[in-house]
Amino acid sequence: MEKTTRRLPIVERDEWLLPAEQELNRRYERYTDKINAIEQAAGSIVDYANGYRYFGWQRDELLDGWWLREWLPGAHDVYVFGDFNNWQRTEIRMQRDAHGVWSAFFPEAMYRDRLRHGSLYKLHVHGDNGWKDRIPAYATRVVQDEATKNYTAQFWAPEPFDWQGDAFDASKNGSLMIYEAHVGMAQEKEGVGTYREFTEKILPIIKKDGYNAVQLMAIAEHPYYGSFGYHVSSFFAPASRCGTPEELKELVRRAHELGLAVIMDLVHAHYVRNLNEGINELDGTDHHYSLPGKAGYQPYWDSKLFDYGKDEVQHFLLSNVKYWLDEFHFDGYRFDGVTSMIYHHHGYVDFDCRERFFDEGVNRDALTYLTLANRLVHDFRPAAVTIAEDVSGMPGMCIPIADGGIGFDYRLGMAIPDFWIKELKEVPDEEWNIWEMWDVMTNRLPEVKTVAYAESHDQALVGDKTLAFRLMDKEMYYHMDRASESIVIDRGMALHKMIRLMTISTGGQAYLNFMGNEFGHPEGIDFPREGNGWSYAHARRQWSLAKNGFLRYSWLGDFDKAMIKLVKRYKVLEDSYAWNLAMDECNKTMVFSHGNLLFVFNWHPTASIPDYELPVQAPGKYVPVLSTDERRFGGQQRQAMDAEHFSFPARDGDNTERPHIRIYNTSRTATVYLRKK
């Protein structure tokens, strides 16, 4: 039994939370009440979250047949039909129990030659909204008819997948270096890429680039490809346009063999409104998986909201959390849309005071659910990671549950890409404020682990721009060949490298990159839609650009590899906060260190300063080990990479004596030096 009257550690550690102590205690009590009830009923939350082993199709060896079960409490009548009964809607009636669960049994002797692996089926549901042909919520395979475009559930009962030998442990990989990817648009061809193609062609690229985790978007089935996977229709079915469930499992297994953790982009913030494909009004009511009326609608996303306070909905979602870890061996989740989940206003307010995090605008049921989800993930797979996409800064998001927190391992550093966009859009280079930059990069509590990123898929979507395109725009079409000369391209490439190095070295304890951005992939993402003639031209990745030895893209890609290698070798992310040594606003130069590494960033567009004197953390010999200005990365090589800089004692402005070195501090350059004793 989890109950306590002690002061929660989250409050003990942060006096700013003292006025909210009563509400934090209530939150913790809501969680403990729920987890205690779960443990009394099922023994543990791991054993509780087994909906996928009861609902849907389940083999009964004792009775020699198959059960089909679905929770439809508001339905008046339910039938199952498919190719196994010539699509006769009202032939096979399901039976209802006292809890609103409808079931039908299919004896092997009767259906052996009719109900086979791959058979198609649907439910015929009579509810308050009339008679509807529907796809079950627990369907594990859903396919689209190419002619009619209709989706249908598929009876999926292959031979068990062979996971033998897959004992991958993500915790042994060190700090997370995440490669964010979308399977469908990962290929160069115009069309939808497959799990198999991703396994064979893209995983080796990710491994070679030095990343140790791949974060997969759009895994759960979604009817509209252009939704980027965020309007989910079937929560237990992998997107069939990319292949079979077994091919997705093979992708995960191969990633593990390469030493790559696989993180799933999990969408539990909302679900698609569609009746034909999704779970909306599945039992005929508007309050099946959501609250009734406006309370169950997300107006900003035109989608439906889950009722996180309903036991059956919590069970459905928690079962879904366990399902992907258990059946597909995913190594954790990025929980999408957490801000929308935890506030009734979905975060569309100014978080200008403490009360915003504790008033009636907070969805307490969602907070309880997320806490339970984190408990489940870490109880079932202790090495798994959970990442929260929360822009509000909700206190306790990454604090352990036992301390009064919500239990996420990481939060996304969403203020970082916003800062870079604002800077590039609104501020001339010579007016960049290096103190503001430093504050944004390091603005996090010590115990809150942050995933730093300069850009993700959000910045690549149509209507926005990638960093590369924001920096170089149409010049990329004409001057990315190595023989061409362009001050726009020179500036863009220099800043592209500096921004990424600044982000990874100061922004957090993990790092994320969206596929292709490491080599400056041009243009944004535009999925096929009526407005572009259903074209796939901008829903793909042009890997050939980075492989073409006559183009500059390979220089950016080579820099990214070198940057990742250095950060991993010297455990920069494990060091958490950088040690700020100097901030020279006049020359736009900042100096900081991580262990024996010294980082010097000169953001000035023109000022290159010979014999520039700067403080270092410890005496010794400093040698450059990485520079954005190296010729191998498309730079001008204005510094000698074999130079040695010996420290000498000197006094700072406050008359404190400390070791210094002198360097050639070149404009728009970031250089990393290694201290040798």
Across the structure, where does each feature detected by a protein language model lie?
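Short glycine-biased active-site loop of nucleotidyltransferases that positions the nucleotide triphosphate
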Residues: Q95, Y224-G229, R273-E281, C398-P400, ...
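Conserved alpha/beta catalytic core and glycan-binding cleft of carbohydrate-active enzymes
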Residues: A147, H329-D331, D350-A539, K568-L614, ...
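Flexible loop/turn segments at secondary-structure boundaries
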Residues: H222-Y224, T244, H270-N274, R334, ...
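Carbohydrate-interacting/catalytic domains
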Residues: M1-S175, Y179, R196-K207, V488-K497, ...
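Short, flexible loop/turn elements at secondary-structure junctions
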Residues: L72-G74, F84, A98, E108-M110, ...
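Substrate-binding/active-site clefts of carbohydrate-active enzymes
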Residues: V143, P160-L176, H182-V362, F646-P649, ...
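Non-transmembrane alpha-helical segments in soluble domains
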Residues: L203, K207, V252, V321-L325, ...
